[in-house]
Amino acid sequence: MTASNRPLCVDLDGTLLRSDILYESLLALLSNNPLYIFLVPFWLLRGKAYVKRQLASRVQLPAETLPYDERVLEILRTTTQRPRVLCTASDRLLVQPIADHLGLFEEVMASDGQTNLSGSNKGQALAARFGERGFDYMGNGQVDLKVWAHAGGAIVVNNGAGLVRAASRQTEVLAHLPA
């Protein structure tokens, strides 16, 4: 499978968005009712996926006002010959409306309240779905090295040359969009 027909899997937080949905949703929740600050530590006892689901079930983020990275949107708009997958550790309840708003993804993979789809969990899920080296992955952070270990190619976004070098030890770096 060549890079031209491998699915392009795109991270949300820090990659497609110049922000993080977890922080956006926490701020929205606390601005609506500051008393939730006392519940969040108890939610954390049940894990990150649980926290994300609790936030997602209580807030709505307007997809049209989120801070998208226009360079990533342009790649997605011009990459129509292969499947595009939004793959994120953010909760599906918040992510699906974003994907629907953009209309650029054929599939969404996201945290679900039980599994935090981050790092090695994300890498394993993508490899199970598309096969080892059967997808390209666009990400922005150290945690994405665990995904690039399974990917056919890497697109590094909003980070420096150090992450590009580290990614190149995992897979072929197809592009670098620095911060």
Where are the model-predicted features located?
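Active-site neighborhood of HAD-like aspartate-dependent phosphohydrolases
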Residues: 1-56
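C-terminal cap/substrate-recognition subdomain and adjoining C-terminal extension
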Residues: 1-7, 64-179
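TOPRIM metal-binding catalytic domain and adjacent DNA-binding surface shared by DnaG-type primases
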Residues: 50-71
